[in-house]
Structure formats: C-alpha cells, structure tokens
Amino acid sequence: MNTTTRRDVRGEFQFHSTGLQPVGGPDRVRRDPVGEAADDLCKAVLTSLRRRDQRERGRQYVRGILATQGRKSIRNIAQQVGGPAAEQSLHHFIAGSTWDWQPIRTALSHYLEESTPLTAWVAQPMAIPKGGDHSVGVGHRFDPHQGQMFRGQQAFGIWFTSSEVITPVGWRLFLPPGEEGAGGPSEREPMPSASGLEAGEEKYESYEECAVTGVLDTVRQCRMPSRPVVLDIRGIGTRSTMNRFAEARLPVLARIGSGARLLVTDPALPGYGAGVLAARDILQNVKGLRIPVEWRDPSHPGARRTSLVAAVRVMMPDPSPARRRQVLLVGEWTDPRRLPSQLWVTDLTRLTPAALLRLTKQARRVSAAASASVQEVGLRDFAGRSLSGWHRHVTMASVAHAARCLGDSVGAVGGGGYARPSAPARVPHPANTSAGVRPAWLWPA
C-alpha cells in the first residue's frame, strides 16, 4: 500500500490508499489550536512577570477564561483550573498583586506584529453596564457613540487590526469627576501612567481626553512602525482631537459629525471663500466628484458592497495660525439620493478616496469582532472595586482574545497557520504615498 507523509497545521498525516490517517494515531492530531495558541502567547508575553508562579497564574487565568462558559468571574475561572484553592491565588493575582500590566500589553502587540503585521489601530468604546456604586468609574452617563444614557463604566479599547487578526491590546477606563477614588485606598497604589491615574493623583479627564490618551499611550508604549489610527470622534472635540494626533505625529482617520465646521481650501470647488461651512454641506456641493468603490463587508463574511465616495481638501478653523492644517474631508454615500452616511477627516492626504474608504472599514471590522467576542472572553466581567484589578483582568482577557483569534486561524479549514508575511515598509507622517499607489499596510480591497 502506497503512503505519502505530509504535515499541516493539525499535525503530521499519512495519505494512505484508504484515506487520510494521522501519523502515530489520533493523539498526534492538534485538537485544541486555541489552547495551544494561548500557551504559546503566555510563554511569550508574560515574561515581564518576575516569578514563575506569577507566570503560571497568568497562564491559568487565560486558560480559565477560554474554558469558562458564561460569566468570566474569578470564581468561575478558578473552577476550570483548580477550584477553591485556585480561586484565592487567582484573586490575589488580579486584585491584590502589584505587577505592571503595560509590558504584557506591549509584548502582546509585538507578538502579533511578528505573526501578522499591523494595518491600523482602532479605538473602540466599550460600555460596561453595572448596578451599584462600588466599582471604580461607575456612573450614570450619556454615551455619545450610542446616543443614550446608561449606568455603568465606560472604557476605550485600542484594537490591533491586521489582515488576519482583530484584537484589543490597550485599555483606558473613563473616570468622571469625583469617581477617581471610588475604588478606595487601592486606587492610590502605584500604577502605570499609560493606563490610569498616577499614584495619588486626583485629575479629572474628559471623555475626549480619555479616548485620545488611551490611543496615544498604547502607541507610544509599543514603539512599532507608524500606522494610522481609526476612531470615531462624533460628539467630542474634532479640532482638539486632530491637533493632539498631529502633535504626536501619528496619522489619523477620524469619523466626524455631519455638522462639524470646516473651510474649503480648493479654489476650484463650491464653497471656497464662503467661510466656515458644515461638513455635510461641503460634501453635498461636490456630489459630482463621487466615484463608486467596492469594499468587503466584515459584518457579512464574503459579501461585497459598493459605496460612492468623494474627498475634498479642507481646513479646520483654529484661533492659532500654526494649527491651521489642511486635511481631507471624506464622504461616503450608501444611497446616492440621500446625505452622506459617514463623514471622516484625515491627514492621510496622499491616499486615494478609494483607499481611504476601505481604511474606514477597519472600524466596522472591529465593531463586528467586538460584538461577537467581547462577551466570550469576559472583557466586561470584572466585578472588583480597584482600577488596577480592572486593568489586570482586561489585560488577561485581551491575551485570551488574541489566542482565540490566532487559534481559530490555525484551526480553520484550509488554514495555513499564522506565519508572518513580509513586513511592510515604515509609513512616514503624513503618509507620503503617491496617488494611486496602495500602501502595503492597507486592508485588502
């Protein structure tokens, strides 16, 4: 009987005349790609934890998250990895320890970059409904992204997006006025400035500042090749947000409200010299410039959509002449007879309208991924009172989320694992890309 031996992501197989059989029997088949990805990740990203028992607690916590059905409380996680005895040690690991979560988040970003290079950072708000008053940051507030009131916590996740992976790697919790000390004395323990208040600091941070600082701190800590930031700034300060990213020399593509006030700077276009105009009116005046662009719909895998898109050079009015910069106003029409469905501003002025439209869909990819996976890894499930405990929990949950992404890519039918493709070139800021040339980091059309 003729046989041929081959290897794929499931292990080593022999192709017999009677069919496919694993070499060495069924035990050689990879039966848990997500678990294996989790072990590999933990080995790589938990190295900043000095003690071996801490690294083991971290691995147990990640594995427990992946194995737990329903709410990912410390008690439920412990039931998967050792019961009551494990519960006490895991509780101390998350809520009572002093390890720094930022090096783990940075290591996670670098691990992912080695596997599947970064396309863009996406800032995604995450509302965490909660009753009671004991958890840090809980309040009754208006969510500008959802357009409704809710009671609970408001966090911002900074998501790593690539052609293969969509996963959070950074977090910041919004702390309203008077809430900074809501977690009690533990809130004043030393914490990394990138992820919360400085030790003993009583500083109010606006919703806008929280969103932008979360992105900037994550990117600074990672020190990776420059990639665009995609975020939604409707309902928060358009001008101040864009200025902060410009000062950080970080390219940005920001969704804005239709009433945002801008100046047309192209003498050949309607609205030039007319003063400050609403963004929707500027775009309605240039409907003749619209072109059709096809894009993949991440909400419906395999589906392709077509939108009309136009881009106009504009300026954000600013009292300081030094801050008056030209940007592109990008409009998308899903219905050509109506007003633009989405409006964006960007300093990626060398990219084509088609490339910019497809880049905006990174936000749609993250929204689709978050709606399907945030609950699966318990990102909203921390029930403790301290800010540091919250950060440690969401850090471990982010590692679990990344393991699920990587493991699912390995276990997919016909999948070839997540071997690293060739690294794309560094992107300068502003993106120095000739019109018509598609940068290597852009998500495929």
Protein language model regions, located:
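A short, flexible helix-boundary coil/loop motif
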Residues: 2-40, 45-54, 175, 269-317, ...
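Short, positively charged, Gly/Tyr-enriched micro-motifs
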Residues: 42-102, 106, 229, 403, ...
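Short, conserved catalytic/metal-binding motifs centered on acidic residues
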Residues: 77, 119-129, 158, 227-236, ...
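Active-site-proximal, Lys/Arg-enriched surface segment
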Residues: 98-178
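Electropositive, glycine- and tryptophan-enriched low-complexity nucleic-acid-binding patches
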Residues: 146-222, 340-341
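An anionic, glycine-rich sequence signature occurring as long contiguous blocks
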Residues: 166-167, 171, 179-180, 257, ...
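Domain-level cores of phosphate- or acyl-group-handling catalytic modules
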Residues: 192-265
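Short amphipathic alpha-helical "interface-anchor" segments enriched in bulky aromatics
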Residues: 350-383
